[in-house]
Design a protein with these regions (language model features):
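Conserved beta-strand hairpin/beta-sheet module of binuclear metal-dependent hydrolase folds
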Residues: 20-111, 214-229
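Active-site metal-binding loops of divalent metal-dependent hydrolases
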Residues: 31-32, 82-85, 127, 157-158, ...
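Residue-level marker for buried hydrophobic side chains located in beta-strands
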Residues: 78-80, 123, 152, 224-226, ...
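Cap/insert and terminal regions of metallo-dependent hydrolase folds
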Residues: 96-107, 218-298
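Metallo-beta-lactamase
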Residues: 100-114, 118-130, 146-204, 209, ...
Length: 298
């Protein structure tokens, strides 16, 4: 598919040793840390099992990354997800332990000599606050898109779901994170599985939330699958380790099975948005099932 928008000529950014897939150089972007309840993150899995790999704090919360992915190439700067952002009040900060002491989205981009105006495209996997919070910022008391020249891509069915949430998932959606994208005419809807930009397509899953889109970056030889909340952490590679947050956990189970089978057979790289220690890895099949294999540096 041809690019929907004209290319811009940008100079190369640091990172000669960074991974490349097709025309794109890939950079894992740390946007900050936060914490969620360990029981909610692992559903029916007993605490004595999950606390071995994800030790909780005194409030039973486990450490979480909010990791985005930057693609640079074809005259574009493409960001996948945007982390929590920085618009939250003291109450939410205390609940979720938001921490940008060591990194935030804009400092991480600045370290690569990228300004907000340089971002051409933002693919939002879904609109939960820990993925879309950084899509907007507060500027002189007004909430505006964080990247003023970017197109923001959201699945249309997910947009509808975010505007009609259930009591179960209502707390995950904050309109300030996404309504300005429409107001400022920077929003573009995707519809199912399609190619968004050259070498970048999306797969749609429905277990965690309705119409979550997982970007797939491929050049026919190397493929990276952006897991989002289908596989938020490396611990979730184990099939029954499924979040209690998921609206349809049995759907998640089958979606995980399908993706992990493909990732094993085709040696995909899996990108983990929330794992505090591992940004990306491959998986392999063993007698005990599919397990984590070698980490991949991004």
């Amino acid at each position: 598919m041809e690019s929907r928008y004209c290319s811009h000529a940008y100079p190369a950014i640091p990172g000669d040793l960074q991974m490349k897939i097709g025309p794109y150089t890939l950079h894992a972007i740390e946007t900050g840390r936060f914490a969620l309840d360990g029981g909610a993150m692992f559903g029916v899995v007993p605490k004595p099992l999950w606390e071995k790999t994800n030790p909780p704090d005194e409030k039973n919360r486990i450490a979480m990354a909010a990791r985005a992915l930057l693609l640079v190439g074809e005259g574009r700067r493409i960001l996948i997800d945007a982390g929590n952002g920085s618009k939250y009040n003291e109450k939410l900060t205390a609940i979720y332990k938001f921490d940008t002491t060591h990194s935030d989205l804009h400092r991480s981009l600045k370290s690569l000599a990228i300004a907000p105006d340089d971002i051409t495209d933002v693919i939002l996997t879904h609109l939960h606050f820990d993925h879309a919070g950084g899509a907007t910022i507060s500027e002189n008391g007004t909430i505006v898109p964080a990247f003023p020249k970017a197109r923001y891509y959201v699945q249309h069915d997910h947009w509808l779901a975010a505007h009609a949430p259930t009591e179960r998932d209502r707390a995950s959606f904050f309109p300030d994170d996404y309504e300005p994208l429409k107001i400022f005419k920077q929003l573009e809807f995707t519809n199912g599985e399609e190619t968004i930009l050259p070498g970048i397509s999306v797969r749609v899953v429905n277990g965690h939330t309705t119409a979550l889109q997982c970007p797939v970056i491929s050049d026919g030889t190397t493929t990276l699958f952006y897991c989002a909340d289908l596989l938020p952490m490396t611990s979730h590679v184990t099939l029954p380790w499924i979040m209690a947050y998921d609206l349809r956990p049995l759907v998640t189970l089958e979606e995980k099975r399908k993706i992990l089978d493909l990732a094993t057979e085709e040696k995909w790289i899996l990108f983990f948005e929330h794992d505090p220690g591992t940004a990306a890895a491959r998986v392999k099949r063993t007698e005990k099932g599919i397990v984590l294999d070698s980490p991949v540096m991004l």
